[in-house]
Amino acid sequence: VRCMKKLLDENPGTPCTLRGIDFAAKDVFDAARSGDALAAREVDEMTDTLGMALASIAATTDPEMFMIGGGVARAGEVLFDPLREHYKTYAFKSCRETPIVAATLGNDAGIYGSVRLIVGE
């Protein structure tokens, strides 16, 4: 949201459905999905940065997969499609096919993890 607000400020003459309203991350993804060019640009920049970060993590840890959770994961393919493409751009060849998926526990993952720690394995 902070980056989108900055992009709006830097592009005062560019039309955007988010201009002049209070918005959340979900609104940025919805606007991008609906064809808003400035929102799509922000999603592309964000997924590029995240893809680069995941590629760096993959280079040092060789994970079986990346699971993206929280509210942002509900954005669906408007998030995951460009993220996967950017990731493949930055990842070493041996890591390029590492799956990037939405976490199935959503926002409750922390609660489940805490309970498991308390109860024990």
Task: Specify the residue positions occupied by each region the protein language model found.
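ATP-binding/phosphotransfer module of carbohydrate and carboxylate kinases, centering on a glycine-rich
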Residues: 1-121
